């Protein structure tokens, strides 16, 4: 659309390592525009999380694609019902370089857990939710628009349920992380 409607402007899509890398690419001027999600842009501008080594960036938003929702799902028959219940479990945490992992680290911290307390599998969302439906992982996560296509596909074959944060965890997250909202 840009190439067709914005005279003198050309855009060429390139494959990157994902929404975690894209702010770094824009900051280093390797690319002019990159796509990421709200929580990662907040972390990048503050220079925290995956951007701690680089430091604060001065990124600007051109627009919004959709709200990102962290889908934390397990089989309806699972004993997992809270973030704390994830300890020691096999979790599909999304693809390497994707936006789920930094967000997941924040959520786990609210239950005094780290990613080291899980057995993480770095899988594309569709593969992770397929593995959940096949009972090869205990839970699967996807940071995407709602509803996530991978969730809908798995839900067609298995009954799923959300893994909830406690009301206290939600209030702490809202106060601690500016990238959270109700």
PLM regions and their residue ranges:
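Loop/turn elements at helix/coil->beta-strand transitions in domains of secreted/extracellular proteins
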Residues: 7-9, 30-32, 57-58, 88-89, ...
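Pocket-flanking alpha-helical
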Residues: 12-53, 126-131, 147-155
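Conserved residues at beta->alpha junctions
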Residues: 17, 95, 141
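Bilobed "Venus flytrap"/periplasmic-binding protein-like clamshell domains
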Residues: 1-13, 64-134
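Solvent-exposed coil/turn segments that connect beta secondary-structure elements
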Residues: 31, 38-41, 67, 75-78, ...
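Pocket-lining segment of extracytoplasmic ligand-binding domains
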Residues: 49, 115-182
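A structural signal for short loop-to-beta-strand junctions that line the ligand-binding cleft
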Residues: 52-65
């Amino acid at each position: 659309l840009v190439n067709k409607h914005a005279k003198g402007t050309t855009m060429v899509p390139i494959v990157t390592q994902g929404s975690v890398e894209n702010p770094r690419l824009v900051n280093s001027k390797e690319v002019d525009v990159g796509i990421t999600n709200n929580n990662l842009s907040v972390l990048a501008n503050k220079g925290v999380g995956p951007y701690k080594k680089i430091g604060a960036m001065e990124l600007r938003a051109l627009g919004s694609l959709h709200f990102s929702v962290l889908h934390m799902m397990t089989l309806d028959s699972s004993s997992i019902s809270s973030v704390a219940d994830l300890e020691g479990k096999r979790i599909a945490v999304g693809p390497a370089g994707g936006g789920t992992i930094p967000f997941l680290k924040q959520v786990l911290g609210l239950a005094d857990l780290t990613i080291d307390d899980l057995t993480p599998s770095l899988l594309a969302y569709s593969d992770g939710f397929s593995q959940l439906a096949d009972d090869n992982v205990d839970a699967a996560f996807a940071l995407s628009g709602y509803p996530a296509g991978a969730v809908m596909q798995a839900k067609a074959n298995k009954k799923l349920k959300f893994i909830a944060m406690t009301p206290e965890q939600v209030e702490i997250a809202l106060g601690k992380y500016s990238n959270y909202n109700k």
